[in-house]
Design a protein with these regions (language model features):
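Left-handed beta-helix
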Residues: 1-11, 215-385
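Conserved core of the sugar-phosphate nucleotidyltransferase
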Residues: 128-253, 280, 363
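Short coil/turn connectors at secondary-structure junctions
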Residues: 10-12, 60-61, 83-84, 111-114, ...
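Residue-level signal for inorganic ion chemistry
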Residues: 47, 103, 122, 165, ...
Length: 385
C-alpha cells in the first residue's frame, strides 16, 4: 500500500476545531476568551501554535477554522495569515460531527479529492518533526482510496478522560515507510478498570482526535451514517456556492438543526462495526509527545516534564518578585500574576488567580473544574463564565 507523499504532491486542507469553551481551565478560560486563544504554555496562543505546527504541511491559505461567534474576531486577529472567509463561526455549538461534516461538504463541491485534516486547536506537540512525518504519511494514505486515517497516541497511563482505539492487523508497506494498523473498534472514555486492561494489553492507543480523509470520503461517511445531517449539509453547501450572504443566512438557519454529536459516535464507531477488513479505518502512531491539555493537571505535567516538580506560571519560584515561595511542597501548579504565593507543606495543588476569581483544587480533581462553571451559570453569574 503506497503511503509516501509530500506537500507538493497532495492537496491538503487542515481544519482546526476551535469552538470549545474550555471550562476545565476556568478561571483563565472564559466564553469570550477560551483556552484555544490563550497562551497557556508560552508566548503563543494554543491556536497560533496549531497553525505553526501545520506550516510544513499546508500554506495558510489552505487552512480553515471552525469556531463560534464569541471567538471568531479574536481568532482572526491572532491568525492574520488565514483567509477571513475560512474562519467560520458556528451559529450553535453542535460538537465535532457537524463541524467535520461542514468542512467535508463545503470542500467536496470543488475539491473532492483534497484530504481534510481535522485538528483540535488546543493540543500541544513537543516533537514537531515527528508530527509532520506522521501527518504527511496520513495524508498520502487518505488520498489513496476511500480511507479514514486516525492518529493514535501510545498510552502512558490508564487515562479515563480519553477515548481508546483497539488496533487490528498491521498493513504491509515498503521499507522505510510508516506502517499503519487497521482499526478494530473505538471505545469512548472507559472506566478505570477497563482503561487498565486496555493499557496492559498493549493493543490500544489513545484517540488523539486527529483525523484525515478526503472531502468525498468524509461527506459520503456522513451520508451513510448520518443521513439527516447530510441533507442539512447539502443545503448549506449549496448556499455557499451561491453567495456569502445566502450562505450566512442558510448556515444560521440550518446548522442548529444538526444533532449534537461527536464525530466518533456519529461516524467512526458505526463504521468500525463493519469489521477491520471492510471499514477502511487506519491508525498511524502518534508518537510525537502529545498532550491534549484537557485540564490544569495536564498543563502541569506538560510544563514540568516530571510530576514532582512545582510549576509556576506568571510567578517565579524564589527568584524575584512577584514570587512563589515553596517550603516542603511539591507537584503544585501556580498561576497568580502580581501576587506573592507561599506554599507550605502542600502537594499536588492547583492555584489559579485572575482579577475576579481564585481557583484552588487538587491536580487529581482538576478534571472537575467545569462543574464550577455549571454552578456559576445556574446562579446567573454570566459575568464570571
Amino acid at each position: 500500500m503506497p503511503i509516501a507523499g509530500s506537500k507538493e504532491e497532495r492537496k491538503f486542507a487542515p481544519v482546526i476545531l476551535a469552538g470549545g469553551s474550555g471550562t476545565r481551565f476556568w478561571p483563565r478560560s472564559r466564553k469570550a476568551r477560551a483556552k484555544q486563544v490563550l497562551a497557556l504554555d508560552g508566548e503563543r496562543t494554543m491556536i497560533q501554535q496549531t497553525v505553526e505546527r501545520l506550516a510544513p504541511l499546508a500554506d495558510s491559505a489552505q487552512i480553515w477554522v471552525i469556531t463560534n461567534d464569541l471567538l471568531d474576531n479574536l481568532i482572526a486577529e491572532q491568525l492574520p495569515e488565514v483567509p477571513r472567509d475560512h474562519i467560520l463561526r458556528e451559529p450553535a455549538a453542535r460538537n465535532t460531527a457537524p463541524a467535520c461534516a461542514l468542512a467535508g461538504f463545503l470542500l467536496e463541491a470543488t475539491q473532492p479529492e483534497t484530504v481534510i485534516g481535522i485538528f483540535p486547536a488546543d493540543h500541544v506537540v513537543k516533537n514537531q518533526v515527528r508530527f509532520v512525518e506522521i501527518v504527511r504519511a496520513g495524508i498520502a494514505l487518505a488520498a489513496s482510496g476511500d480511507r479514514i486515517v486516525v492518529l493514535g497516541v501510545p498510552p502512558t497511563r490508564a487515562e479515563t478522560g480519553y477515548g481508546y482505539i483497539e488496533l487490528g492487523a498491521e498493513v504491509a508497506v515498503a521499507n522505510g515507510e510508516i506502517a499503519p494498523r487497521r482499526v478494530k473498534r473505538f471505545t469512548e472514555k472507559p472506566n478505570a478498570a477497563l482503561a487498565e486492561q486496555f493499557v496492559a494489553s498493549g493493543n490500544y492507543v489513545w484517540n488523539a482526535g486527529i483525523f484525515l480523509w478526503s472531502a468525498r470520503t468524509l461527506a459520503n461517511a456522513i451520508r451513510e451514517h448520518q443521513p439527516k445531517m447530510a441533507l442539512l449539509m447539502e443545503r448549506i453547501a449549496e448556499a455557499h456556492r451561491t453567495s456569502q450572504a445566502e450562505f450566512e443566512r442558510v448556515f444560521a438557519e440550518v446548522y442548529p438543526q444538526c444533532e449534537n454529536i461527536s464525530v466518533d459516535y456519529a461516524v467512526l464507531e458505526p463504521r468500525s462495526v463493519k469489521g477491520e477488513a471492510k471499514s477502511e479505518i487506519y491508525c498511524l502512531p502518534g508518537d510525537f509527545d502529545w498532550n491534549d491539555l484537557g485540564c490544569w493537571s495536564a498543563l502541569h505535567e506538560h510544563a514540568a516534564g516530571c510530576p514532582p516538580e512545582n510549576v509556576s506560571v506568571a510567578n517565579v519560584f524564589e527568584g524575584q518578585d512577584p514570587l512563589c515561595i515553596s517550603i516542603d511542597s511539591t507537584g503544585n501548579y501556580v498561576h497568580a500574576p502580581g501576587k506573592v504565593i507561599a506554599l507550605v507543606g502542600v502537594n499536588n495543588l492547583v492555584v489559579v488567580q485572575t482579577e475576579d476569581a481564585l481557583l484552588i483544587t487538587t491536580r487529581e480533581r482538576s478534571q472537575d473544574v467545569g462543574a464550577v462553571v455549571a454552578k456559576l451559570k445556574s446562579a446567573g453569574r454570566e459575568d464570571l463564565i
